[in-house]
Every structure is written in structure tokens, then in C-alpha cells.
């Protein structure tokens, strides 16, 4: 029994110690707020010195390392620097785009933020002592620069080709009704007096004169097609002295291809240009026909008897007279002449074909020089004719023929 009592007494002492240790501290009772778990909330205050610490105790918290100090120093230096001025954003303004009567159409446009100071800074970087070339320019780049300098010198020596400027567009008042005005977009004609002079100079050419006199029905060269020739001269962009006879026929062929689209009329141009060679074809066919009929019926009869003569070679050799032998000997000669005429005709036909191909090739280059603009408006044709209305070319009207 004594042992059990001593055990219970020891247990009571231990429980008493535990209860005394769990009693709340008087300082913790003064805190007004408590957590839900029963433990007091701790307040952490940064940058606050609690007083001098003991000599062996480090006052800095363990979580603040050397990297944290560097960050603090960098943040302090950045605060001391003046704030960098930001580039102002481009402003937007409203600009008048079109004025139609009492109505005005506005267009939103941004104002550039480039100032004269930026140009000065850029020019200062291009000082004589500063090398503006980047360090990564290699030997290949030097070769390219040398080649570029040589090409520029060669271009300066060669005469520059004058390109035809594109036609500008303007707005013309088409109708005015009260306070309302109807506008119409219209292209400004690029035909200059130089082009009219070049056209008049080509009309004095004897070949072109014969061509206009040859086209009596005006199927290929009426006044509208000839006015299109002047318009094409202005669009091609060549100097006025450079236009020759072939350019007149190239422009006229393009005009017929654009307006008429008649193969017969275009073939008439080829027939007139190459009629010296083409006119010989019927002359070649005529002697061919004459030589075909030059063999008399008796010679044809002897020719049909050739298989029979072969069968009866010995008898026919005696029966045939010298005249039949003479007709038979003429057959190879006729074949030879017919073959020669056929070859001569084919060579001339090939020559004509090659000339037509060359003409079509030059027509394509002329069309590309006009920037592929072959359509001419009726207003532009009227302006071209109004430049010199008394010219004899404008009297070539198909309506006057009927």
C-alpha cells in the first residue's frame, strides 16, 4: 500500500507542475486580440532598434543576407538618380481630306514627334573622327561597295532613259445644281506638243503616206486610231526624236488590237509591210501551175504506160518512137523545177514568218514601255484632236464614207 501511495503522490506533483506552466502570462492577457488557435499574434516591426544588445548577440535577423544588403544599396542609389523623361506619345490631329460643296471630310493624322534636337544628335554622331561603319563589315562587304561604286560610275556615263510619269488625277465639276455640286474624277492627259510634232514628222514619211493612201476604207487608220497613236507616244516615254516609222506601226497595231480586235485588219498591216515578199508567192504559184500543165496529154499518156513498158521492155524499146522517149525524159526535169520552186517559196515564207515574229516581239516591248496602259478614254482622244482641229488627219472619219 505504501508503494501505491507514493506513486499517486508523484503523479499529482507532476500534474501540478504542468498546470502551473500552462497558466497565462500577465503580459499576454493585456493583448486585446487572440488567434483562433489560442496562441497570441506576434507583431513584427522593420527598421526598429530595440536597444543595445549583448556583446555576443547579433542584432540582425538571420533571414537578411548579403544579397538583401546589395538590393537595399541599389534601391537607395536608384532613388537618388533623377527620373528619366519619357518620350511624349505622338499627338493626333484632324486634317481636311476633301471639300465637296458645304460638306467637309476630315481625316485623322498623327503628328510626328521628331524634333530638331534629334537631328542635331544624329549629326553629332557622324563627326569626322568617328567611324560610322559597324565592326561586322567583312571583306565581302568591301567587294560589294567597290562593285556598287563602279556600277554608279557606269550609270552616270550611260544616258538615262526618260520614264513616262504616271497621269495625275484631279476632280472636275461635272454638274452644279443649287448648292450641290457633283464631282468627277478625271485623269490629266500627259500628251505634250513634242508628241504632236513627232506624229506630224512621221506623217511626212513616204511609207506612211502610201499606207494611209492604201487604206481607203479606213479600216486600220481612222481618226480615233491615229489619235491613240499620239497617246501611246506620250505614255511610252521616249524622246520625240527617237520615234521612227516602226513605232508608228507598232502603236497603230496596238490601237487596232485594243479597239477593233479584228484579225483581218491587223493582217492588212502585215500585208502592207511585207508585201514585197508576200506578193511573190502568187507569182511562184503561177509558174508552178504552168509547169504542171506544160506536160501535154501525149506525155501524160506515155507516163501512164511506164508500167506496161517495164513489162515489155524489149518490145516497147523498139515500138516507142524518139518523140516518146523525149517526153519521158522531161518528167524528171519537171519534178526538179517544181521542187526548186517549192523550196524557194518556203524560204520566203519562213522569212516573212520571222519578220512577223520580230514585229510581235517589238510590239510587246513597246507595250511594256507604256506600263501596260493601252486603254485611252474618249475625253483624252477629244483633247488630242482639239490641239489642232484643222489637221487633215482628223478628217479620216468612217461616218463620212457612208
Swiss-Prot record:
This is Speedy protein E2B. Residues 16-39 have a biased composition (Polar residues). Residues 76-89 have a biased composition (Acidic residues). Belongs to the Speedy/Ringo family. Residues 1-89 are annotated as: Disordered. It comes from Homo sapiens (Human). GO terms for molecular function: protein kinase binding. InterPro entries: Speedy.
Amino acid at each position: 500500500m505504501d508503494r501505491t501511495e507514493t506513486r499517486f503522490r508523484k503523479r499529482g506533483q507532476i500534474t501540478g507542475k504542468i498546470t502551473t506552466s500552462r497558466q497565462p502570462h500577465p503580459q499576454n492577457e493585456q493583448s486585446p486580440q487572440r488567434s483562433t488557435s489560442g496562441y497570441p499574434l506576434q507583431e513584427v516591426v522593420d527598421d526598429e532598434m530595440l536597444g543595445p544588445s549583448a556583446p555576443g548577440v547579433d542584432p540582425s535577423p538571420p533571414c537578411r543576407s548579403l544579397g538583401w544588403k546589395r538590393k537595399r544599396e541599389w534601391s537607395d542609389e536608384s532613388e537618388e538618380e533623377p527620373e528619366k523623361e519619357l518620350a511624349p506619345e505622338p499627338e493626333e490631329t484632324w486634317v481636311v481630306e476633301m471639300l465637296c460643296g458645304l460638306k467637309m471630310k476630315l481625316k485623322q493624322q498623327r503628328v510626328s514627334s521628331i524634333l530638331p534636337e534629334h537631328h542635331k544628335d544624329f549629326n553629332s554622331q557622324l563627326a569626322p573622327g568617328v567611324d560610322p561603319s559597324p565592326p561586322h563589315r567583312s571583306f565581302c562587304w568591301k567587294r560589294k561597295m567597290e562593285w556598287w561604286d563602279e556600277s554608279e560610275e557606269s550609270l552616270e556615263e550611260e544616258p538615262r532613259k526618260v520614264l513616262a510619269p504616271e497621269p495625275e488625277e484631279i476632280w472636275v465639276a461635272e454638274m452644279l445644281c443649287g448648292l450641290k455640286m457633283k464631282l468627277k474624277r478625271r485623269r490629266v492627259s500627259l500628251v505634250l506638243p513634242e508628241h504632236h510634232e513627232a506624229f506630224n514628222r512621221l506623217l511626212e514619211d513616204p511609207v506612211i503616206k502610201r499606207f494611209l493612201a492604201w487604206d481607203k476604207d479606213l479600216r486600220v487608220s481612222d481618226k480615233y486610231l491615229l489619235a491613240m497613236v499620239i497617246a501611246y507616244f506620250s505614255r511610252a516615254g521616249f524622246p520625240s526624236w527617237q520615234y521612227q516609222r516602226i513605232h508608228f506601226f507598232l502603236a497603230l497595231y496596238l490601237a487596232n488590237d485594243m479597239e477593233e480586235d479584228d484579225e483581218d485588219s491587223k493582217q492588212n498591216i502585215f500585208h502592207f509591210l511585207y508585201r514585197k515578199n508576200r506578193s511573190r508567192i502568187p507569182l511562184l504559184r503561177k509558174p508552178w501551175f504552168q509547169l504542171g500543165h506544160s506536160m501535154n496529154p501525149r506525155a501524160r499518156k506515155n507516163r501512164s504506160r511506164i508500167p506496161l513498158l517495164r513489162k515489155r521492155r524489149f518490145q516497147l524499146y523498139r515500138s516507142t518512137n524518139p518523140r516518146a522517149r523525149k517526153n519521158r525524159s522531161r518528167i524528171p526535169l519537171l519534178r526538179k523545177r517544181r521542187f526548186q520552186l517549192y523550196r524557194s517559196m518556203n524560204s520566203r515564207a519562213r522569212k516573212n514568218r520571222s519578220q512577223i515574229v520580230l514585229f510581235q516581239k517589238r510590239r510587246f516591248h513597246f507595250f511594256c514601255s507604256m506600263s501596260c496602259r493601252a486603254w485611252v478614254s474618249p475625253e483624252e482622244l477629244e483633247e488630242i484632236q482639239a490641239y489642232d482641229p484643222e489637221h487633215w488627219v482628223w478628217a479620216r472619219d468612217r461616218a463620212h464614207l457612208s
